[in-house]
From Swiss-Prot:
This is Microtubule-associated protein VP6. Its main location: virion. Keywords: Capsid protein, Host cytoplasm, Host cytoskeleton, Inner capsid protein, Virion. GO terms for cellular component: host cell cytoplasm; host cytoskeleton; viral inner capsid.
Length: 649
């Protein structure tokens, strides 16, 4: 059976049949890049979760209906080289775990959808116009087959969903396209056998016309000029109150200077800004659903049509030029090998974006050259990197020797307002109870030390595990809290968590090799730990733990870093957690935000060796990630850190 040569949709490799059927109803992109853009545009509105190849995927349609689906296996066909590939296939354990060789697939296997694993075969049977439910790819060598798994699915989905701050568009533009993308572009069989055309108008209609698009201050100026020409369009402008253009003009300044009676909605925080965007999108989609045509953001009122505009804040972008890097002596063999790989692949020049705050701008302008010995915190305050190699390099800086200098300071606007959710206004750290969600080695420690300088006590994310260890020893929750939080800051942080201790025990007793790599959620050691975590999560409810901590802090205060002592009240209290289950177990919370770094937290854990068993730490981090859903405002650590530094002076 000859494989079709239609241009394919690159994202369909990652989608199960229900989602694939949804995409096929839309116009077909003519190029690979348009397919990737569409995939990214869709996933920016959805949450997609991948744990391996038989993962549960959370899918949300325009109607916000969520269902669990299973990712389908793929079929890899090699009509002329099957025997040659098979001769070396069993020399590759990674492929054995992922692919099952079946030389002759039967029609019944495809018809009943009986495949439970990716398959390598010499050819496909005739289907007699019946539907093949699996995606099909042609491979000619063992390297072609390996390349289909060389671009980690989980890493790609991290990028697409914003769990890492690298944009898919930048990734594809600046790195080579994986071979499986090229295969997919050329050889995919549509499940309905229909080829549809695509025009720019179609793409705009499906992915732009249905929602209000955030604009930059510069674009707002142009829109105002256009409006003054036709004299008919009114604008409702939404903007965070401190958003400025690259010429340092605020939204209010621009509107006043235009002389037009536009409505300006100034919001106090970027989280409010993001919620207003979501509300407008829902209104547009609802209108589209009822009127059977693409929704417009024009709202009818007595003054005529009014268009909603969302104005994006700018970022400062700089090119960073690196000197040749060397590795600091005295590190272990695993760390040295990883650092050598990072240094060999690291770019000599990369671009980084910072939150557009005056102190960052002055630092960039006044401090042109700096050394890796001056502390890595300022590097981590960026909000966007354009390449994964630069991300690895920034993560490794504390273990490297070298210098940098800045070039080409400019302003830029990123199209994804996801990066600004939560915003620059962190005054809520000064009042009420705030919960910060962050992965391990995700910048919590740096943020906590800055918050402590405001006089606000911070409860560390590992304190819950430390309390459980004391409860295991026979103490009540209240007695355990009293014992732990009566210690000074350094003593408290040096106390071992029950979770770290138990994961290390599981790893030491397991017969599996202790690999220092990114773990899979299906790892049996993670499954074993999940039983332990669930048991103690029920025995020591997080709500009871927080209530006891609040009571203790109210009566006694709390010791912080560098001799800081909080006052004896918890009107302002920050609680750091690892996961959504912990963050949602108690009431009386003023704000819940999630922070994420631009560095690679897994590489960071390998290099810093905070615990005695790095393998156990990686597994524990992977478990926290596997039970966490991102339902909160996403806020770059760089935004929080730069704003807090401005507040504390």
């Amino acid at each position: 059976m000859e494989l079709p040569h239609d241009k394919a949709w690159a994202y369909l490799l990652l989608t199960p049949p229900p989602l694939r059927d949804y995409f096929i109803q839309l116009p077909k992109p003519a190029t690979l890049q348009l397919a990737l853009n569409r995939f990214a545009a869709y996933l920016e509105k959805q949450y997609l979760r991948d744990s391996l190849y038989m993962e549960k995927i959370v899918i949300g349609t325009h109607y916000n209906v969520r269902k669990n689906r299973v990712l389908q296996p793929r079929i890899f066909v090699s009509p002329s080289n099957y025997t040659r590939i098979l001769s070396t296939f069993y020399d590759h354990p990674d492929l054995i775990a992922e692919v099952l060789p079946i030389q002759h697939l039967s029609k019944s296997q495809l018809k009943r959808g009986g495949l439970t694993k990716n398959v390598l075969t010499s050819g496909l049977p005739e289907m007699n116009n019946e539907q093949n439910p699996y995606a099909v790819f042609e491979v000619n060598t063992i390297d072609d087959l390996k390349a289909c798994f060389a671009f980690p699915t989980e890493w790609l989905i991290d990028i697409l969903t914003g769990r890492n701050s690298i944009s898919l568009h930048y990734t594809i533009d600046r790195t080579s396209i994986p071979k499986w993308y090229a295969h997919l572009e050329a050889r995919f069989q549509y499940s309905d056998g229909v080829t549809k055309s695509l025009t720019d108008a179609d793409l705009r209609q499906h992915y732009i016309g249905v929602q209000p698009i955030p604009v930059t201050c510069e674009e707002l100026l142009q829109k105002m000029n256009d409006a003054s020409i036709n004299g008919n369009t009114m604008y409702r402008v939404h903007g965070y109150e401190s958003i400025v253009s690259s010429r340092m003009e605020t939204v209010n300044d621009l509107v006043k200077a235009s002389g037009k009676p536009y409505d300006v909605v100034n919001v106090q925080t970027m989280s409010s800004y993001s919620r207003s965007i979501s509300k407008a999108i829902n209104q547009a989609v609802t209108k589209d659903r009822h009127n059977k045509h693409v929704g417009s953001t024009k709202l009818k009122n007595s003054q005529g049509p009014r268009t909603t505009i969302f104005v994006m804040p700018p970022y400062i972008t700089v090119d960073v030029v690196c000197s040749p890097m060397t590795i600091k002596p005295g590190l272990g063999p695993i760390q040295t090998k990883l650092l050598k790989s990072i240094v060999d692949q690291s770019p000599r020049r990369f671009r980084i974006a910072y939150a557009a705050k005056p102190q960052i701008e002055q630092d960039v302008l006044n401090k042109r050259i700096f050394s890796t010995d001056e502390g890595p915190e300022s590097y981590f305050q960026g909000v966007e990197l354009l390449t994964p190699e630069a991300k690895s390099l920034l993560t490794a800086l504390p273990q490297l020797v070298g210098t940098f200098h800045y070039e080409k300071l400019s302003y830029a606007h990123f199209p994804s307002y996801r990066l600004t959710a939560g915003g620059y206004n962190v005054d809520y750290f000064k009042r009420g109870v705030t919960v910060i969600v962050a992965r391990k080695h995700g910048g919590k420690g740096m943020v906590a030390k800055l918050i402590w300088k405001l006089g606000t006590p911070v409860i560390d994310s590992d304190d819950y595990g430390r309390i459980i260890k004391l409860v295991e020893a026979g103490l009540t929750i209240d007695d355990a809290v009293t014992q732990l939080f009566s210690m000074d800051y350094d003593q408290r942080n040096s106390t071992v968590s029950a979770f770290d201790e138990h994961m290390e025990m599981i790893v030491s007793q397991s017969k599996m090799k202790q690999e220092i790599t990114y773990p899979r959620a299906s790892d049996p050691r993670i499954t074993a730990f999940a039983d332990y975590y669930s048991k103690w999560f029920l025995k020591v409810p997080y709500s009871d733990y927080v209530a006891s901590v609040k009571n203790f802090v109210t009566k006694n205060g709390l010791s912080g870093p560098n001799g800081i002592q909080s006052t004896n009240h918890y009107d302002t209290l920050v609680i750091q957690v690892h996961t959504l289950p912990e963050a949602t177990q108690f009431l009386g919370v003023n704000n819940i935000i999630e922070v994420y770094p631009i560095i690679d937290s897994y590489i960071g854990m390998i290099l810093r060796q905070q615990t005695s068993n790095t393998c156990a730490e990686l597994l524990l981090a992977r478990y926290y990630e596997s039970i966490h859903l991102r339902n909160f405002d996403m806020l770059p650590v760089g935004v929080v850190a730069s704003t807090l530094e401005a507040l504390v002076g």
